[in-house]
């Protein structure tokens, strides 16, 4: 299969070059109600037949593109994920392939290694402790409602939104996750995003634009923010600023599942604490890779390839598809295409 060939090719390259430690990168809300789940579609488009979601939950996701499940992840699991994150921040753990990101405003201040300087870790699929999140049975049973039984963990994050420095760099611009993904169909992709503590507008909760998952993928680029923008924080260049928005106030353990075309972002953290959340983007292994050449995704493809080539010390040996094939990991079922 392609993923075997690509993985083997990269493994050979890395075998000669050795694997470096995790790369470190310097990295106007209007509230509105979600649409009521009172419609009867002729055919469900965004959810699969199952006995997990109630009819009302299924209708809500179909109409709005997201669904919050309360108290899904235990306090004990969240504490374990927090402890492992702190070990990574202290550089006691260096899983292969993981990216450690710093806030663009904080990175210049020269703090010692700690959670104070790390704003996010990405691609922790090879860290067995954090990967437990991706495989939690209570998470996976909901994921299967969107992806079907063959489930891949495609992209993982533990987000540590820092107190804003005053430059508003702790914001995450409104975006669609599909901008970052070279695989389709989008309806077989879902994100699980779990609050690791109480999250509200004060510390930068998620904000979503209900129903936008029904629209197209929009062009993304870096927003022109005066205080600077974190690495790979692309945002939508064209959206209706008057669109209704919902701010997701969540308690520790609450989990939101959302579609990759749903427009969402987060505000700045106005508190003195660090706002933590853990997430995984899942895709059905029946999805297929696509070429993004000539599309609005070319800009992120160039950026990801550049980072991967720098990490692995290779030039011209990778394409966008390779970077995903090497990172993703099977969660359940059979690995078919991805």
Curated annotation (Swiss-Prot):
Transit peptide segment: 1-30
Main location class: other
Residues with N6-succinyllysine modification: 59, 108, 231, 252
Pfam family, one: PhyH
UniProt GO BP: 2-oxobutyrate catabolic process; 2-oxoglutarate metabolic process; fatty acid alpha-oxidation; isoprenoid metabolic process; methyl-branched fatty acid metabolic process
UniProt keyword annotations, A-Z: Dioxygenase, Iron, Metal-binding, Oxidoreductase, Peroxisome, Transit peptide, Vitamin C
EC number: 1.14.11.18
Disulfide bridges in this chain: none
Residues binding Fe cation: 175, 177, 264
Names of the cofactor(s): Fe cation; L-ascorbate; ATP; Mg(2+)
UniProt pathway annotation: Lipid metabolism; fatty acid metabolism
Activity response to pH changes: Optimum pH is 7.5.
Matching InterPro entries: PhyH (IPR047128), Phytyl_CoA_dOase-like (IPR008775)
SUPFAM superfamilies the UniProt entry points to: Clavaminate synthase-like (SSF51197)
Subcellular location: Peroxisome
Catalytic activity: phytanoyl-CoA + 2-oxoglutarate + O2 = 2-hydroxyphytanoyl-CoA + succinate + CO2; 3-methylhexadecanoyl-CoA + 2-oxoglutarate + O2 = 2-hydroxy-3-methylhexadecanoyl-CoA + succinate + CO2; hexadecanoyl-CoA + 2-oxoglutarate + O2 = 2-hydroxyhexadecanoyl-CoA + succinate + CO2; octanoyl-CoA + 2-oxoglutarate + O2 = 2-hydroxyoctanoyl-CoA + succinate + CO2
GO cellular component: 9+0 non-motile cilium; peroxisome
Keyword Metal-binding recorded: yes
Molecular function GO terms recorded: carboxylic acid binding; catalytic activity; ferrous iron binding; L-ascorbic acid binding; phytanoyl-CoA dioxygenase activity
Positions of 2-oxoglutarate binding: 120, 157, 175-177, 193, 266, 275
Function: Catalyzes the 2-hydroxylation of racemic phytanoyl-CoA and the isomers of 3-methylhexadecanoyl-CoA. Shows activity also towards a variety of other mono-branched 3-methylacyl-CoA esters (with a chain length of at least seven carbon atoms) and straight-chain acyl-CoA esters (with a chain length longer than four carbon atoms). Does not hydroxylate long and very long straight chain acyl-CoAs or 2-methyl-and 4-methyl-branched acyl-CoAs.
Assembly behavior: Interacts specifically with FKBP52 and PHYHIP.
Family stated for the protein in its record: Belongs to the PhyH family.
Name by which UniProt lists this protein: Phytanoyl-CoA dioxygenase, peroxisomal
Source species: Rattus norvegicus
